């Protein structure tokens, strides 16, 4: 019996730490950002997870998932990424950004 090839998609993950005082403006910007990015060809989803750290700051994880590595590459090079959106609203604190393959 032949095995089916694995389903693979391609993803970015960005992590940022922001001040709680920045949250109201950032939340509205994230809603607009999500609507904008999900219109890009090949974007399956944009998800943001939030946790409040012990010092009261907020830790955000932003994930985008793409159909092909080419679509992800174009987004990272020229698209309106999470990092670019944060810079536009005057928020600093990007901790790391990764490009990954999503297996499940």
Regions found by a protein language model. Give the residues of each.
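Short, low-order "capping/linker" segments at domain edges
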Residues: 101-104
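An amphipathic, aromatic/His-enriched active-site/gating alpha helix that lines ligand/cofactor pockets
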Residues: 5, 32, 36-44, 65-99
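Short, surface-exposed ligand-recognition loops at beta-strand->loop->(often short) alpha-helix junctions
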Residues: 17-29
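Extreme N-terminus of proteins, especially the signal/transit-peptide cleavage junction
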Residues: 2-9
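Short, well-ordered beta-strand segments in beta-rich or mixed alpha/beta enzyme
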Residues: 9-17, 47-78
């Amino acid at each position: 019996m032949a095995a089916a090839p694995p389903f693979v998609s391609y993803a970015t993950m960005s992590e940022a730490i922001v001040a709680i005082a920045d949250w109201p403006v950032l939340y509205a910007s994230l809603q607009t950002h999500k609507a904008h990015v999900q219109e890009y060809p090949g974007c399956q989803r944009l998800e943001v997870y939030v946790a409040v750290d012990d010092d009261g700051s907020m830790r955000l994880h932003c994930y985008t998932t793409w159909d092909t590595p080419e679509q992800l590459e174009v987004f990272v090079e020229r698209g309106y990424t999470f990092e670019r959106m944060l810079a536009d609203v005057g928020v600093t604190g990007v901790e790391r950004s990764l490009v990954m393959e999503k297996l499940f």
